[in-house]
């Protein structure tokens, strides 16, 4: 097999690694043969021997062949033995193939290994996991769902236990004690999100530092690395709670007006569409008619009447040309004028919706006029006819009025977004009275996740379900920055090479393609492209019926829950029994997917349901051509298409895959340029017949590249914007650890408080020590009491230079932290942590708002990322000052109480 490597894999780096791996594999197999003379009881002793050698400074590279050989030998000894996996007894039948050893070596060297589906990634993981566990610093294995974490930890746990290592898994709602024990195991399985949330929870706790459940970040092996490190990386991990400062919910009161404007817009679109059809029937189409189409498109890209009109190839070609013209700088004024003829504009690609001037006037233009709050407050403060209390009341009233106005405008915009760009059963489902988000890549419901920035509340209002309080962010971290905390990370996936650049650029990991154990004989059938979704779905049903007639099993995979429901209904009409998976129960779906290869079985599934589960062919299926996988549309990523194809033809089995597509699919509609084919399509289109053109593969590839580039840019943008937040989070969590572990709380806090005390001294006392009078000291002591509740007598500071005053204040504050509420070990630290956490929460809220608003500065020719970094730094300085002032004030009040 290795002799074919250089022929199959041309990449020099890939080839060089495989050449070296070939020699190491030969050595591993030689050692494994020698280990057959050992008894089962000798294996844990061998593990202990490896641990001692590493602790004594032996090079890990010398241990690797021996360690891998021992793992392979343990797997061989388990063959035929029964292992309980998720309460189901299974006979062990796995011993590492040579290519699995190669993959293990890649993972040991912190690479991303491209391992074809069905090649045994679960068993491969045992090799680097065992080797890294020998260091005694913990080893995490991240999976895509809790079922796989439980299954793999119990399944592979038999192997680890034979070698003398412990293995456990973590899951949501697990008790802290159980979780701590799981993390203390040599090898810990879990989902990436659970690992991340446990990190955030550990650093939000006010209990002892020893109560943290995690024990550090040494090595993490990521199964399905593309899904975790790329797809999930677009959504940061967030722990949130109810916003204590949240005002009244404005959404319910605004539902009626927003529905009126949406209804008015739909009627206007219908009128423009009918006007176009009338001109089309009379062969009198003009530029004005196409401008009307552009108006409809600009406010409602998914408008059904528009999509129906664009089925005419000639019309579509002319319209595509118009869209290109409107994107040019010279036509921006015209494009703006056309959009202003509608009530609002919506951009499907960017998920943005804005009211036009006409739309603002619909509500009464004054609703969108927000006064300059700063100018109003300055005017109040300059008003000599008002005393201080009245000025304070007037300022607060003006601030309330401003907040109510901006909240109302903000809520209107969020409702517009919810009504125009977020579709039920495509972007979300409503289940048990709750709006639940659908992951666009996997088709899974994202349990517990909520859209931020009040969008989720807007969708809840739209669906007339209970509107939950807007939460404030307590702690957050991006997937990228969480995994960057590990000293070593590695990953496996069937599609690593597709994202090799991103793995290298973001995570510093090389990607390497591992050859399959047996040649893949998957049959890639040509795509079938249709004009409409209706024709496409009919063709898919016909294909399923043909396969079902001969007993060939079919797995039809859709991009959304809505599409899976459509296919399911159509199959019921044709009386075709089938299983339907909407990716809501990992364990149930794994069982159904595993049986999808049985003769005559038809399974409808969303993109990633049952991922990580092998589909084994039933008796007689091989002769029928194996499993037929149908893709109901091309995904935005070629990588996800490849994952879908990988459902069949595993381990040398036969199998076939075919994609169906239509010009109404998202990929074609949003990302593909097919305008140059419109004349041909118009002439050749026959209802229900597929188009054939050698250009379609390149059109689809270009569209996917365009979508992938946009998504990659979004992930890079998230990482850049998260950089200052990541720095601030690390500092805050380090501060928390110091506070929780310090012997003397006051003196541990002094470095944090000194800058504020120095600022107070410099602000309230003359610059020259010779100018500090008794009157100045008296006023300074008064300021200390007013600003910080810090009680100190002027006579204590009389005659002292500023640096001595500063030192004395530091000592005074530090001493106060040993009294009153702070004298209680847990209570005092808990109080300080509460103040720090509150300041950090407010900081995160400011940054969240800033992240949404900073891109507006691009219109002023300013770099949004640079602007964000500058504003984030200002907010961080504010956090430090707020924390220090609050602590000094707390210490002052403690002194007064005593």
Question: Model-found features: residue ranges?
Answer:
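Conserved P-loop NTPase motor core
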Residues: 1-687, 734, 751
């Amino acid at each position: 097999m290795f002799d074919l490597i250089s022929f199959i894999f041309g990449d020099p780096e890939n080839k060089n690694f495989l050449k070296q791996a070939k020699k190491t594999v030969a050595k591993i197999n030689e050692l494994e043969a020698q280990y057959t003379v050992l008894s089962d009881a000798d294996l844990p002793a061998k593990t202990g021997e490896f641990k001692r050698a590493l602790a004594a400074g032996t090079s890990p590279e010398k241990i690797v062949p021996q360690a891998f050989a021992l793992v392979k030998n343990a797997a061989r000894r388990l063959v035929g033995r029964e292992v309980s996996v998720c309460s189901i007894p299974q006979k062990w039948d796995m011993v590492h193939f040579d290519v699995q050893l190669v993959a293990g070596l890649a993972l040991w060297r912190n690479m991303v290994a491209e391992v074809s589906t069905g090649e045994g990634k679960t068993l491969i993981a045992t090799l680097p996991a065992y080797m890294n566990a020998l260091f005694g610093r913990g080893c995490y294995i991240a999976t895509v769902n809790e079922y796989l974490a439980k299954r793999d930890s119990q399944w592979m746990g038999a192997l680890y236990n034979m070698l003398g290592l412990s293995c456990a898994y973590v899951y949501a709602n697990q008790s802290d004690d159980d979780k701590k024990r799981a993390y203390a195991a040599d090898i810990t399985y879990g989902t990436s999100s659970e690992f991340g949330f446990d990190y955030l929870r550990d650093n939000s706790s006010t209990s002892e530092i020893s109560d943290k459940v995690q024990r550090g970040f040494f090595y993490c092996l990521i199964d399905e690395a593309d899904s975790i490190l790329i797809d999930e990386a677009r959504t940061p991990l967030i722990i949130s709670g109810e916003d204590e400062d949240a005002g009244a919910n404005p959404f319910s009161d605004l539902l009626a007006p927003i529905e009126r404007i949406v209804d008015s817009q739909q009627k206007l679109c219908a009128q423009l569409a009918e006007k176009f059809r009338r001109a089309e029937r009379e062969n009198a189409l003009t530029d004005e008619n196409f401008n009307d189409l552009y108006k409809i498109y600009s406010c409602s890209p998914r408008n059904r009447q528009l999509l129906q009109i664009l089925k005419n190839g000639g019309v579509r070609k002319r319209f595509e040309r118009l869209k290109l013209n409107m994107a040019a700088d010279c036509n921006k004024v015209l494009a703006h004028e056309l959009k202003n003829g509608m009530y609002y504009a919506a951009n499907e690609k960017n998920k943005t919706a804005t009211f036009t001037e006409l739309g603002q006037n619909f509500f009464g233009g004054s609703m969108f006029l927000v006064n300059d709050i700063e100018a109003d407050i300055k005017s109040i403060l300059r008003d000599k006819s008002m005393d201080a209390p009245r000025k304070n009341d007037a300022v607060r009233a003006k601030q309330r009025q401003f907040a109510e106005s901006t909240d109302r405008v903000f809520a209107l915009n969020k409702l517009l977004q919810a009504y125009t760009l977020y579709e039920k059963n495509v972007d979300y489902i409503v289940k048990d009275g709750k709006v639940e988000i659908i992951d666009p890549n996997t088709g899974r419901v994202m349990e517990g996740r909520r859209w931020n920035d009040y969008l989720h509340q807007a969708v809840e209002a739209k669906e007339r379900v209970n509107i939950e309080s807007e939460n404030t962010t307590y702690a957050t971290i991006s997937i990228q920055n969480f995994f960057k905390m590990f000293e070593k990370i590695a990953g496996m996936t069937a599609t690593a090479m597709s994202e090799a650049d991103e793995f290298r650029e973001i995570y510093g990991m090389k990607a390497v393609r591992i050859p399959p154990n047996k040649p893949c004989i998957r049959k890639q059938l040509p795509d079938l492209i249709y004009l409409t979704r209706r024709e496409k779905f009919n063709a898919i049903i016909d294909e399923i019926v043909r396969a079902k007639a001969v007993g060939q099993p079919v797995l039809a995979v859709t991009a959304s829950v809505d599409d899976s429901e459509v296919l399911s209904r159509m199959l019921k009409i044709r009386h075709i029994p089938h299983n339907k998976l909407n990716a809501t129960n990992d364990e149930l779906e794994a069982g159904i997917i595993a049986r999808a290869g049985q003769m005559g079985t038809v399974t409808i599934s969303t993109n990633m349901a049952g991922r990580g589960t092998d589909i084994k062919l039933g008796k007689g299926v091989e002769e029928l051509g194996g499993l037929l996988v149908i893709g109901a549309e091309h995904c935005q990523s070629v990588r996800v298409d490849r994952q879908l194809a990988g459902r069949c033809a595993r381990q040398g089995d036969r199998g076939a895959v075919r994609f169906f597509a239509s010009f109404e699919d998202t990929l074609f509609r949003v990302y593909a340029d097919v305008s140059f084919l419109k004349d041909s399509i118009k002439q050749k289109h026959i209802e229900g017949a597929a188009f054939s053109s050698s250009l379609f593969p390149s059109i689809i590839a270009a569209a996917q590249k365009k979508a992938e580039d946009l998504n990659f840019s979004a992930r890079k943008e998230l990482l850049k914007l998260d950089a200052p937040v990541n720095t601030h989070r690390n500092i805050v969590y380090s501060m928390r650890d110091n506070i929780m572990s310090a012997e003397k709380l006051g003196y541990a806090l002094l470095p944090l408080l000194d800058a504020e005390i120095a600022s107070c001294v410099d602000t309230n006392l003359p610059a020259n020590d010779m100018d500090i009078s008794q009157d100045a000291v008296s006023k300074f002591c008064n300021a200390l009491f007013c600003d910080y509740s810090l009680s100190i007598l002027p006579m204590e500071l009389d005659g002292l230079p500023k640096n001595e005053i500063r030192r004395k204040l530091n000592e005074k504050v530090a001493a106060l932290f040993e009294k009153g509420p702070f004298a209680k070990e847990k209570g005092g630290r808990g109080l300080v942590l509460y103040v720090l956490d509150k300041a950090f929460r407010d900081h995160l809220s400011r940054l969240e708002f800033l992240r949404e608003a900073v891109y507006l500065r691009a219109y002023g020719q300013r770099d949004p990322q640079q602007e964000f970094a500058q504003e984030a730094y200002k907010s961080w300085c504010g956090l430090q000052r707020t924390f220090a002032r609050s602590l000094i004030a707390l210490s002052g009040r403690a002194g007064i109480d005593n």
